[in-house]
Amino acid sequence: KPENVIAITPMKVLTGVRPQGELQELAEAFGADWLSSRVQLSPKQLLTEIIRLPQDAADRAIAGLVNAAQKLMTQDGVSATVSDAADLVNLVAQKYPGDKGLLVAFVMNLMNLAPGDSAFTPDGQVHAYVSGTAIELMNPSDNVLRAGLTPKHIDAEELIKVLGEHQDAPVLQRPAANGLGV
């Protein structure tokens, strides 16, 4: 379902799939062979293949990301994209150890929202709120589908069915003052 999120506190938001250039950069920096072989896939196909990875392959991929992230955090000269991804991997791995959702989070666009910023997510778009407090505005519905990073019910196959073909990053919307105090 479509939704708009408005940050109350600083927030980390994951939404859609990173552009292929960023995916390739991350695959190389993290030594993520599981991703290198999938960079050219459509966003929907990439997410589908990651969600359907056998658990033993996912466990190896997660361990590789966590190990690489810890090394990259101490290196100088890494790009902001790689540094932010390393921070994300560490944060998610600590909150949800061993969760396959980490692999999905790794390929998603990371947005940092300041208080008052908002981002619109269309229906069929994978998204997650990693940290922070927000107000969510959405259509009434009971069809929340989860693929990981939660203790709640997960229905990854149903999520795959409703994923949109395009998984672009939303446009960040910043508040503008309309006058004194408004």
What do the PLM-derived regions correspond to, one by one?
Residues 1-117, 127-182:
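Active-site region of the double-stranded beta-helix
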